[in-house]
Amino acid sequence: MSMRGSGKLWLVMADGQEDPAVFTSTCLPSDSRLLATVTNAYLGTRVYRNILHVSGVYNGAAGDTHRADIPSPVNVRMTVPDGDVPVETFTLNTRTGTFSHKLESSSYTATHQIYAHHSLVHLMAFSITIWRSAGTSQPITVQLQAPFVPKSQDLDLQQGPDFQGAHYIYGQTLVPEVEGGPQPTVHMLWTPVPQAVTLHEEEQERRWEFLTAVAESEEEAKRSYSEGLARMAAGSLHSSHTRAWAALWRGCCVDLEGPLPLRQALYGCLYYLLSAIPPQGTPGFHFHGISPGGLSNGTRGEDYWGHVFWDQDTWIFPNILLFYPEAARAILEYRIRTLEGALLNAQEQGYKGAKFPWESAATGREVCPEDIYGAQEIHITGDVLMAFEQYYHTTQDQKLFRTDGGWELVSAVAQYWCSRMVWSEEEQCYHIRGVMPPDEYHYQVDNSAYTNAVAQRSLNFAASVARDFFIPVPEEWVECAKKVKVPFDAVRKYHPEYDGYSPGEPVKQADVVLLGFPLMHPMHPEVRRNDLVMYEPVTELSGPAMTWSMFAVGWLELKETQRAQGLLNKCFSNITEPFKIWVENSDGSGAVNFLTGMGGFLQAVLFGYTGFRITKTNLRFDPAFPSDVSKLEVTGVSYLGSKLKFSITKEKMRIAVTKCPLHPPLEAVLEESGQRFPLHEGQSISFPTAAGCIQKAPSEGL
């Protein structure tokens, strides 16, 4: 059953409600950049695009390095002979991770489905299915436009022998990122695509399936292709993909009783972020990070060329961590694997320790094409460490730090910050000079409030981990953390963005407001409010999409819910129709499929509406949401190995425990009354909505 209106068409659920997770349209956007993307942790493309990308496969030296374009065999468009005018619909089903194109006429229905297999990450596939309507018998032919050319500007492609009916090409990237650096070889097998498929007169229905396997070894490509063929023969290729997506959604969902566009935005954001993470149950998955435009984007000159920024660690990571800590760990492992490059970056700039690149690709060396960002936008190093800190407090996974390289990274970052600080005799505190803050309108400034606060947090975390592991804490870490300057105007009671900032000066994006969240820098609520009031009117209206999400979190913290709602509503000008693809700037400029903006928006709900805050000892909650939302449900919150479901209304809160391996279990503690509720697996608790926290219950006998 479906409803139509304004060129869009929505799926209607059994209860008569439109399904917020299914986006359908009778036409495609005129700008092809706004087409839906289908990706998994290894492969990605935009539908109807002639290229695909492989995670971690870049071509080009230093600032020229970009995702290597690989010709896409899944770039196929279904058409019908002239004279036939079927009803046409295009659908992105975020529940199943599948894009489909449907042609319906009085005599037949033809459907084209395309997907990147979520659990068999080396596979992309598409199918064509034709159903005959009752009372018809003539042959039905659907034409397939497949403009595939086995060429690439980034790979030295050669043809190999066919394998199990598949064509085979392989080739190495042309230019390494650094001299002597890796030049991966890509191997691709694909089912040849005919010019047309025909449902013969004696057939009622038929499906044709087409497979593409991509890997960095011939052996893996062939193994994956054979596995795909076996699933096809068993009729389970697509169903195994949709089962993987169903399991993902069971362990992670955000829904609410409120406006449909808000619900759709949440499903869209989660779909595009979940598409990027390793499949569940694959520890050790060799992950290559998440770029602002995702794996589908990042060809030369597009979407920051597929490089990884703070967007991953600050904007995307917290959402992944809250639901899937194993996937969050894979993101951190990418930073650990590129630590060697970060050590060299610091050394080249004359500092100790590790300086993470503003733009990172395969090696951790700086690949930003403009020197100033790599030299001055150094808050990235603290942003990386904050992700490690959030992970540590959420999971208590000591193995990552003790044996898997985490501690080496933490201590190297602490060394970097100490070496980057200089003592000011005049002010009797440490300065960090000559930086570019998150607000990129300003550079070569001293004592960026955000940069210095994130450096302080890095040092405090490093000292805390050292104490946990009984490692002597260098006195320098403690001193630098204690005495680093975070600019504060005691008269106006607000944080100037940097030394010499004049109130009213324009700001590109959220900067000082990030002190409150995610940094949780200690401050009085009056100061938090003043920072919001000071910077909101001077922040660029059409700036990056995550900006207003962070202002919204601030106002929600202060319980000014309607003010928060007004700011969150601004985000909708960055969401495009019909597939909910985000653009970086509201005027349509900048990166497309902007996962960073989606991450910020999700945080506004996941950490703003709920009041979730990850601290050293607990997971705090303090709900507040605007009047047009009557109920919020967050399924699959992960904390210390447990899985929780929060159902929140303005009057009542319910926490259900779906998994709790801990003994003693977790408990919920209310802030004001001190009331405690043990959280046992399979049970739920409820209480009047109030602030509180989830923490480990004290051991019996203590």
From Swiss-Prot:
<keyword id="KW-0326">Glycosidase</keyword>
<dbReference type="InterPro" id="IPR008928">
    <property type="entry name" value="6-hairpin_glycosidase_sf"/>
</dbReference>
<protein>
    <recommendedName>
        <fullName>Protein-glucosylgalactosylhydroxylysine glucosidase</fullName>
        <ecNumber>3.2.1.107</ecNumber>
    </recommendedName>
</protein>
<feature type="binding site">
    <location>
        <begin position="310"/>
        <end position="311"/>
    </location>
    <ligand>
        <name>substrate</name>
    </ligand>
</feature>
<feature type="active site" description="Proton donor">
    <location>
        <position position="440"/>
    </location>
</feature>
<comment type="similarity">
    <text>Belongs to the glycosyl hydrolase 65 family.</text>
</comment>
<dbReference type="InterPro" id="IPR012341">
    <property type="entry name" value="6hp_glycosidase-like_sf"/>
</dbReference>
<dbReference type="Pfam" id="PF03632">
    <property type="entry name" value="Glyco_hydro_65m"/>
</dbReference>
<dbReference type="GO" id="GO:0005975">
    <property type="term" value="P:carbohydrate metabolic process"/>
</dbReference>
<dbReference type="GO" id="GO:0047402">
    <property type="term" value="F:protein-glucosylgalactosylhydroxylysine glucosidase activity"/>
</dbReference>
<comment type="function">
    <text>Catalyzes the hydrolysis of glucose from the disaccharide unit linked to hydroxylysine residues of collagen and collagen-like proteins.</text>
</comment>
<dbReference type="GO" id="GO:0005829">
    <property type="term" value="C:cytosol"/>
</dbReference>
<feature type="binding site">
    <location>
        <begin position="508"/>
        <end position="509"/>
    </location>
    <ligand>
        <name>substrate</name>
    </ligand>
</feature>
<dbReference type="InterPro" id="IPR005195">
    <property type="entry name" value="Glyco_hydro_65_M"/>
</dbReference>
<keyword id="KW-0378">Hydrolase</keyword>
